[in-house]
Amino acid sequence: MAFAETFKALSDPVRRQILELLKKGALSAGEIASHFDMTGATISYHLKILKQADLIFESREKNYIYYQLNTTVLEEFLLWISTLKGDTSNAERE
C-alpha cells in the first residue's frame, strides 16, 4: 500500500466528503457532483486521486460508472495507524 498516495488523497476536504458519501453505497459521478458546487471536471479530478490511492473503485453498469469505497485499503490503513499507537491486538490476530 502506498501511504503517500493515501495521505495525499485524504488531505483534501472534498475528497473526504466524497468518501463520506460513498460509505452509504455506490454512487455515479453525477450523483456525487450533485452534492458539491463545482464542475464535473473538478469532481472527476478528485475521483481520479481517490482511485489512484485505491480508496475507491469503479464498476460499470450500462452507460454509467459507479464509485464505491475500497474498504480493504481503509482497513489496512487503520491497522497501520493502530500499530503506531501501540495497539498490537489487531496485528496479533492475523
Please place each PLM-identified region on the residue numbering.
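Amphipathic alpha-helical dimerization/coiled-coil segments
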Residues: 1-2, 8, 73-94
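N-terminal helix-turn-helix DNA-binding core of bacterial DNA-binding proteins
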Residues: 2-39, 61-73
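Short, low-complexity interaction segments enriched in Ser/Thr/Pro/Gly
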Residues: 5, 45-48, 59
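Solvent-exposed, charged/polar functional surfaces in cytosolic regulatory/catalytic domains
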Residues: 13, 50, 76, 80
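Alpha-helical residues within the helix-turn-helix
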Residues: 34, 45, 51-52
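DNA-recognition element of transcription regulators
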Residues: 41-43
